[in-house]
C-alpha cells in the first residue's frame, strides 16, 4: 500500500470498530463469552486485516510491515480483545517459513488436519476439513485459514514470550523454543492484569520444524512490532479520553483542562506518542527491507511505544481522578491493556539491552 491507501485502510478499520461496541465485546470476552469478539475478528477479516502478513501464494495479501502497523495501531486504539500480535503477525511469519521449507519429518506434512489431532482442539470448527490439505501441505492450509479469518492462532516463544495469550480463542497454538517449532500442548492458565487476556503455559508436542531459529527470530520481531503498534494506538485512545474528560470535569468553577499543570501533562503525553511514531515506522520499514538494523529498530520502537503508552495511562488515571479506578468505566479496558502489553514480547530492560548491544557492536542473541 501507498501512504494514501494506508490512510484509507486505517480509516476503514477505525470506522468498522467505531460502529461496534468493542468495550462490551471485551467485557464479555473477559467473562468467557468469546462470541461477540470473534464476530469482530470475522468482520475485520472481511477488510483483509487477517490476511496482511500472509504471503500471497497462501491466499494472503503479502502486505508490508508498515501496513500491518497501521492495522494493529487501530486495533489497539479500540482495545480489540484477542491474540492480535500473535495471530496477525508472528504466527503467519513463522508458518510462512514452515510452508516454504516443509514441516519436520514427523509425518505431519502428508496428513490431513484430523490426523494431527488438531480436531480435538477445535480446529475442525474453522472450516478446514479433514484431508483438505492437498498439495499446499499443513502449513499452507493453516496460512490459508489465517488469511480467510477462519483460524485464530497464538504461540509462546520462551523466554521473551513465556505464555500463549488467549489460547481459548485460538484454534492453533504453537511453541517456538530452542530453534524448534512445536504444536503446543496447553498447561496451566494464569491470570493477566488485563481481564480480557488469558495466559496459558505451552509445552512441546509434536515437532513441526527443526532448525527454525532464524524464522522464530523474525516472528518474534514482527510480533513485537505489532505489539508496539497496539500500544501506540492504546496510548492515543487514553490521551483522547483524558482530553475529553478534562474539558468537562470542573474544579473551582473551571474545567480542569484549563489549568496549566493539566495542559502540560497532556502535552507531554502527546509529545511522547508523536516521538514514538517515527521509531515504529522506521522499525517496520527496516523489517520490510530485511535491514541489518531491524532487530535494534524493533526494540527501540517497543521501548518508545511502551513508555509513551504507559505515560498516557498514568496521565489518564490522574486526570480522571477516583472514577478512573472503577472497572465500570471503559477507561479501565485501555489501562489494563497497556499494563499487560508493556512487558509483552520482551521487557523494556531486555529491549534496551538489545539496542545497547547492537549499537556497541557486541551483537548477542536476537
Name each model-derived stretch.
Residues 100-240, 244:
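FAD-binding core of flavoproteins
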Residues 65-68, 87, 139:
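Amphipathic alpha-helical segments in well-structured domains
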Residues 82-99:
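N-terminal glycine-rich flavin-associated loop
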Residues 1-78, 103-132, 221-366:
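Alpha-helical interface subdomain recognition
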Residues 96-97, 145-146, 286:
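Hydrophobic side-chain positions on well-ordered alpha-helices
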Residues 17-20, 75, 90, 94, ...:
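Alpha-helix C-terminal capping segments
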